[in-house]
Amino acid sequence: MVYSYTEKKRIRKDFGKRPQVLDIPYLLSIQLDSFQKFIEQDPEGQHGLEAAFRSVFPIQSYSGNSELQYVSYRLGEPVFDVKECQIRGVTYSAPLRVKLRLVIYEREAPEGTVKDIKEQEVYMGEIPLMTENGTFVINGTERVIVSQLHRSPGVFFDSDKGKTHSSGKVLYNARIIPYRGPWLDFEFDPKDNLFVRIDRRRKLPATIILRALNFTTAQILDLFFEKVVFEIRDNKLQMELVPERLRGETASFDIEANGKVYVEKARRITARHIRQLEKDGIDRIEVPVEYIAGKVVAKDYVDASTGELICAANMELSLDLLAKLSQAGHKQIETLFTNDLDHGAYISETLRVDPTSDRLSALVEIYRMMRPGEPPTREAAENLFENLFFSEDRYDLSAVGRMKFNRSLLRDEIEGSGILSKEDITEVMKKLIDIRNGRGEVDDIDHLGNRRIRSVGEMAENQFRVGLVRVERAVKERLSLGDLDTLMPQDMINAKPISAAVKEFFGSSQLSQFMDQNNPLSEITHKRRISALGPGGLTRERAGFEVRDVHPTHYGRVCPIETPEGPNIGLINSLSVYAQTNEYGFLETPYRRVRDGVVTDEINYLSAIEEGNFVIAQANSNLDDEGRFLEDLVTCRSKGESSLFSREQVDYMDVSTQQIVSVGASLIPFLEHDDANRALMGANMQRQAVPTLRADKPLVGTGMERAVAVDSGVTSVAKRGGTVQYVDASRIVIKVNEDEMHPGEAGIDIYNLTKYTRSNQNTCINQMPCVNLGEPIERGDVLADGPSTDLGELALGQNMRVAFMPWNGYNFEDSILVSERVVQEDRFTTIHIQELACVSRDTKLGPEEITADIPNVGEAALSKLDESGIVYIGAEVTGGDILVGKVTPKGETQLTPEEKLLRAIFGEKASDVKDSSLRVPNGVSGTVIDVQVFTRDGVEKDKRALEIEEMQLKQAKKDLTEELQILEAGLFARIHAVLVSGGIEAEKLSKLPRERWLELGLTDEDKQNQLEQLAEQYDEMKSEFEKKMDAKRRKITQGDDLAPGVLKIVKVYLAVKRQIQPGDKMAGRHGNKGVISKINPIEDMPYDENGTPVDIVLNPLGVPSRMNIGQILETHLGMAAKGIGEKINAMLKKQEEVAKLREFIQKAYDLGDNVCQKVDLSTFTDDEVLRLAENLKKGMPIATPVFDGATEKEIKELLQLGGLPTSGQITLFDGRTGEQFERQVTVGYMYMLKLNHLVDDKMHARSTGSYSLVTQQPLGGKAQFGGQRFGEMEVWALEAYGAAYTLQEMLTVKSDDVNGRTKMYKNIVDGDHRMEPGMPESFNVLLKEIRSLGINIELEEE
C-alpha cells in the first residue's frame, strides 16, 4: 500500500486476514444525501421541494375562472454563517423564493381562453439548511434529525395468531396502508364472515365496499367462486364433474358412470379414485336429487313467462325450488362450489349479513359509519366514497406503496397509479380468502422488506407539504373573493403557515433531537441512528417483543448490538457500517458476486427482499488465490436460515467481516470474544467518553478509528494537496500543487481552526494542528486534530497499565483503584465549558439595568466586575460570585419610619431596585474565558459591548488582512515567475515595489496576457476583500434581533478543569464499567521487577460471569504493543543505526499469519523511519478488525518479539510492604475511558433552601437545591430500632414543622442546641384533605 507523507508518521499494524474489497463509505451520507435531494432542483418533480409544489399547485378558484400556477423556486443565501448563528442563537437558514404565475381566464369565452397572466416571485419563509456535517443549527443549538424506520406503504396480510378469540381460532386480516390517506382493513370474524374497516372505524360487511363499487350480488359471487353446473335431463339430475374437487370428501352416493362404480357410498375419495376418473375421462355423473338441496345458487333465475323471480343469487336450493325451476324451463342450474377444506363460503355467508342491496344503500351505510349523526344525501355519500380512495388529493400510495402492493399481489409491473382501483380492492380480498383457505402465507411485519427508512429530506418535504396545503385553502378563498384585476400572487400567499410548519418540525418534532456531542463518535452515531418511534411510528408502550428483536434481515443493514438499554431497547437502532438506503427507502447492504464457485470483485447492493432469493456465504469463508472456496461445503445464509451449501450453489459473499455491526461496535477490538450484552454496553459507553486534555490513540484498535475521526467532521481535512506554508494554533495555510489549482486563482487554501468552543454537552471543542511547516500534503490528509482525535485517529480515552488483582477491597463490586500518577500526569483531566446567560428585560415597572451599582453588596463581591457590571475575562470565579450585576425595579412598598429617614439622607437608589444579578451556580468554579453582549436594536450599547465590538472588528480585520497578504504573496510569486520568464531580470524586480510590477509590459504576447489576467485577479481580490470587510463590519455593528421584551443578553463562558477523582465513572470498551473508589499514592501501588508501578487495579471477578474476554486479550495485546514501543525507544536512546531500527520495525509489521497489510519500510527515507520510530516509541498501535482479529498465536508471537512472557502474566510486588504477591498477575495496557458521569455534577448537599408550598417540606433534586428524602421505609427502620427522638426530629424540625425549624435555626446560631418540635405542616394538610371529603375533624388540646 502507498502511504502519504502524513500517513507515514504513524502506521497502525493491521492483523486483518481478509482484504478490504470495498472502502468504508462516507459515514454521514444518509443525512447529507437525503437533505440534498430535498433542496436540489429536480426536473422530474419526484422528490424534494419540487414534488411538494407540484402536488399542491396549480390552485384553481372555486369558479374555475382563475388559477395560481407554480413556475420555479430558488433558495437565497443565508444571512449568517454557521458559527455566527451559534453565537447569536439564531437558525441557520436560507430564504425560499418561489416564482408563481396567476392566470385569469375569460368568463364568457370558450374554455381555456386566457385573459391575463401575472408572474411574480413570492417569499415563502425560511428553510433551515444542513451544515456540512449533517446537523442543523436551530436557535443557536446544533440538532440532528434522526431517520425513522416505519411500516412501508403497501398491502400487508397478517393474522392475530389466535390471540383475539377465546377458542384460539386464527383470524386473518389484510391492511392497505397508503403513504397518506385512510387505511383500509379487511378482517375475518370468528364466524368466518369477512368485514371491512375504513380508517380503523366501526366494521362493516366487506361486501358493502364491493356494492359501493357497483358490483351486483351475482357479479360478486362470480368474482370469488368457482361454479358447479347441474343439468336436468329426462327427469334425472346430472352434475358436471371436475374430479380434483372431490379430493378428501366422503361420497354420499355411489359414484358411477358407464355402469362402472368408481367410489362406493360412504367411502372417502382418495387421489387414486381421482386418477381413475380422470383416466377414463369422466366429466359428468348422475347424482340423486337430494344432493342439490342446500347448494347455493350463483345467479338470479326468473320465470320467463311471468317475469317473476324464482330464486335470487346466493339463495340456498331446496327440492321445491328445484321443481319450480324445472317447470319454468331452466334446465341448467349454476351453483357455487364450496367445501370445508379449501373453498370456504366466506363471501356468500357475508352477503347474508350484509344489510344493503344496491349501490346507494351501500354508500349511505359507509357515509353513516364515517360521519355519524349527519343526514346522508346521495351526492354527499358519493362524494365521500370517491374522496376516500379514488382522489389524488386525499389518497396517495406513493411509488413505494404501489411497488409493494403490486409485488404482494404478484403482478408483473411495479409502477402504477397512486390511488386504488376496483381491481386492487377485489384482488386483495381474493388473496386474503386464499390465505384463509390455506393457500399463501401471511407477511412478516418485522422483515426489513416491509419497513422503510424515512430520512430528513422526506420528513421535511412532508411538513412543507402540510404548510402548503394550509396556504392552498386561503388562496382558493382569495381567488374567489378578490378583485382579480388588481390581485398579485404576493397578496395571496401568506408565508406564516409554511414557515410555522417547517419551524415546528425542526424545532420540536420528536425526531429533531439535541445533538449528542460528547465526542466525535457520539456525533456520528447520532446521525446514523434509526428510530422506530416518532410521528407515524410506534410508541414505547405498545411496542411488543417481536418489533424489538433482532431479525435475520437486519444482517448488514441494522446493527444487532448497538441499541439503548431500558424502555427503548430494540426501537432505536444504528445503521450498519456499509448499509445504505435505495431509491424506495429500503435498507440495502453490499455483497460480492459469486460465479461458478469463484468470488469476483463485482459488488451488488441487495435489499432485504432481493436477498431472500439468494445463497450468501460468510465473509470469513476461506478462499484460494483465484477466489475459489477452499471447502466443498460453505456456511451460508438463505431465506433467513444458516446452513451448509455446496460451493456451486453460492450466489453472493459478504463484503467484510464488520459488515453486520455499526460504527460504534466496530471500534471494539476482539468484539468476537465478548458476550453480546456486554458488547452492547461497550458500544453505548464509548459514546459517553469525555474528550481528555491530551488525546491518546488506542494501542489496540480495529482500524476504523481513522474513518470515524475524518468523517465526523471534527478534524480539519485537506481539500487539495500542496505544501504547508504557514501554521499556528488557529490557522493553517497550504500552498496548493500546480496540478490541483483551478485556472485564475491564487492557489492558496486557508484553514481556520476552531478554538475552545463549547459543545452541546458542555465539553470542549478545540482543534490543534498536526502538520509542520514545509510538509507535503495530499488531498484527504488530516491537518488538525479535533477533540478526541490523535494524528487523525479517534482517541476517546487513554492507554492505562492495568493489573487484574484484588487490592484491599478497593475493587469490590467493580470499583476501580487508580494511581496518583494518573492524576499528576493529567491523563484523565477534562475541560468543560459552561455558558451562563443574563437577560435584561423591560418590566412593567421599568427596564432592568446591567450595572456594577448593586444595592447591599460589598466591595469584595464586585471586585471582578468592570464598570459596566460585567465580569472581566480571565477572572477565576467560584460558587456564588457575581458574573453580571443586574438590578430590577421593584414596586413601591410601604416604608417604615427608619427607612424613610435613611432614604432622606442617602437618596433614592437603594430601595426601589432589587439585586437580580447572574451568579455562579453552587458547586461550580472556573475561569471566565469569554463574554458576549447582545444589545437590542435601538438600545444604547454599554462600554463593555463597544469594547467587545472594537475587538471583534480588529480581529476580523487582522484575519482578513492576513488572508489577503497570504493570497497576495501567492499571486505575486506567480507574477514574478511570469515576468522573469518574460525576460525581466529578478534583481531589477526586487528593486521595484510589488504594485509597480503589474504596470510592466512584456514583448511575448502570451506572457503579457498571463500578466494581465493576474492583474485582473489582483484587482478582484482587493475588491473582494473590501466587500468581505464591509459585510463583517455590518454584521458586528448592527443591533441584535432579540426576543420581544428583551433589551440585552450577556453570555459568560466558564471553563472548568476537572481532574479525575473518586466517584467518577470509568469504563473499558467491553462493557467493563466501574466507579473510582480511591486514588492511591504511587508508592503504594503494586509494581513489577523493573519497579514500574501499575496505573489501575481492576477486579478479576468482573470477567468470568460477564463473559467479556475481549478485555483480557486487549490487555495482552496492549502489553505486547507497549513492549515493542519500549524496544524501539531503547534503540533510539542508544542511537542505533537506522538500518537496525528499520529491520526491527519491519519485523514487527511482518509478524502474523497471512496478514493482508504489507508495509515496506525499504521505500521510506531514513528521516521517515526515524519519525515513524519516534511516534512508535510509546507503543506500536495495532488494529485487530472485528471478527477478523489477532489470534492467540499471533498475540504470543508479538509478546515474544517485545521481550515479554508469552503468558501475559508477570510477578508483582506490594507497594506498601515490598513483598512479592503469591501468584503471577495479568498486567497489560487497556484503553480506558472517562465517562460523562462525573461526581462533580452529581454531588450535592443541602443546608437550608426552598420548601414546597403546600406541604412545606424541602424540595428534592440537585436543580432545586433539594434535600434527601426520608421515606416511609426509612421511617420503619428508625421505628424498628426504637429511635424515637431521632424519628421525631426527622419528621418535624428537619422537615415541615415551620415554627420549630426557624426556632431551631435561631437556637443553633445562639449556641443553644435544643429543639422544640411542633405540629408538622403535612399533618395540617391531611386534616384539610379529610375536611374536603366532608368529614369535620378537629384537634382538641388537653
From Swiss-Prot:
Keywords: DNA-directed RNA polymerase, Nucleotidyltransferase, Transcription, Transferase
Taxonomic classification: Bacteria, Pseudomonadati, Pseudomonadota, Gammaproteobacteria, Enterobacterales
Pfam families on file: RNA_pol_Rpb2_1, RNA_pol_Rpb2_2, RNA_pol_Rpb2_3, RNA_pol_Rpb2_45, RNA_pol_Rpb2_6, RNA_pol_Rpb2_7
CC terms in the record's Gene Ontology section: DNA-directed RNA polymerase complex
Family per record: Belongs to the RNA polymerase beta chain family.
Gene3D superfamilies linked to this entry: 2.40.50.100, 2.40.50.150, 3.90.1100.10, DNA-directed RNA polymerase, beta subunit, external 1 domain (2.30.150.10), DNA-directed RNA polymerase, subunit 2, domain 6 (2.40.270.10), RNA polymerase alpha subunit dimerisation domain (3.90.1800.10), RNA polymerase Rpb2, domain 2 (3.90.1110.10)
Protein name: DNA-directed RNA polymerase subunit beta
One GO MF term: DNA-directed RNA polymerase activity
A Gene Ontology biological process term: DNA-templated transcription
